[in-house]
Amino acid sequence: MARAVHRSGLVALGIATALMASCAFAAKDVVVAVGSNFTTLDPYDANDTLSQAVAKSFYQGLFGLDKEMKLKNVLAESYTVSDDGITYTVKLREGIKFQDGTDFNAVAVKANLDRASDPANHLKRYNLYKNIAKTEAIDPTTVKITLKQPFSAFINILAHPATAMISPTALEKYGKEIGFHPVGTGPYELDTWNQTDFVKVKKFAGYWQPGLPKLDSITWRPVADNNTRAAMLQTGEAQFAFPIPYEQATLLEKNKNIELMASPSIMQRYISMNVTQKPFDNPKVREALNYAINRPALVKVAFAGYATPATGVVPPSIAYAQSYKPWPYDPVKARELLKEAGYPNGFSTTLWSSHNHSTAQKVLQFTQQQLAQVGIKAQVTAMDAGQRAAEVEGKGQKESGVRMFYTGWSASTGEADWALSPLFASQNWPPTLFNTAFYSNKQVDDFLAQALKTNDPAEKTRLYKAAQDIIWQESPWIPLVVEKLVSAHSKNLTGFWIMPDTGFSFEDADLQ
């Protein structure tokens, strides 16, 4: 009898031990529910922030940005810039290896920047690197990068999520297929990519930072439906979800096991007006439309309070951003200006959106109603990614059907050049970049170009302010709001958060 009890005790102990081991393993596996799918795992060939964010599982850059969008060293220890602003010399950390065992060194950096700056590779992020004349490996830990002309924002380009260090061995092995075979220096390596369902990454045992990563795996799971994404948190199917639909935020906030986070962002939402087309070529019309929109009401109706009215064309947390007195809501003034512009009865136009999710739909409906109150009839269209690529990003000024266009921009370099030049410089009309207002002002172009030729912060401040002053006065946009980024996570998950550019930070994430 005693023997039988002893055996059952051993069995019970074995079961308990197995369960404990199983739970311990499961406790280190995190599922992240995200709003859309991934296009590629090659950061240099991804136009979407989400793909670049997931690629941070595998990849690191020479530099990065912290939560305040300030520059930090990652694979680099330091850098210097020549007096003429042409040459950047970067000192690298020693003793780091890629996940395939290849040494990380100056030769590896050269291989990556040579690839990125070669137009023959047709990489989507080529515009970031087109100013590189040559990259030289001076010794194993020293890289010299020579530019074609001074470009004072270049160090921020090296901190952009696209500027990832890929194993040169893997680049040679996989070539154009590298987007399916990521090999970097990051804390995780690829486990599985089911292209219709999820990306799973696992701990890289040879990671160069001691004690990291703390998780065994992360599964990135695209969940397009807002309600399903929120429900996965409540059932425990996911430990982190982003974005959280504004209408679900209050419900999740009441759940004692979930923490809701509303983080600052650099995501500015705006409506561009095609200034090469009537009636938007008339400054009074553009001014009228800015008076016609009640931004505080828009914050409540479309964003459930998780946004702030825009105070400029560059979000406040971006370096060299200028703030102005927000446009007041004044429909009477709007009608007066329309009358002065020759449109006493208003006019008809189109209003397109770059996205078709629920928040974009609400913005379109709200704006349509606001414009109707001053006599403007707007036919609205919420586009999917394919429509946007074909009708907006892929057509030049003569072919473009863009009139009013609701969209957003996140300057992931954290610096004013990438917040201004792609959106307002004359050379950046579609299909080159994203100046969907087809705005052109020689003074603005000159100020932006001059700002890139100086490393003097005071001079850069003066030049960027001058450019923003003109843009604000000429109003090719209706600046709307700067979003707050709403995410939610299980309370036992720590160290996992959203960056201001909508990317993720998770290097020291852990489950308690």
Swiss-Prot record:
The family database entries (CDD domains) matched by this protein are listed as: PBP2_Ylib_like
GO term, biological process aspect, one? dipeptide transport
**Quaternary assembly:** The complex is composed of two ATP-binding proteins (GsiA), two transmembrane proteins (GsiC and GsiD) and a solute-binding protein (GsiB).
Under which name does UniProt file this protein?
Glutathione-binding protein GsiB
Tell me, what is one Gene Ontology molecular-function annotation carried by this entry? peptide transmembrane transporter activity
What is the organism field in this record?
Shigella flexneri
Compartments reported by the entry: Periplasm
Signal peptide region? 1-26
Q: Which domain of life is it from?
A: Bacteria
The cross-references to SUPFAM superfamilies, in alphabetical order and at most eight, read: Periplasmic binding protein-like II
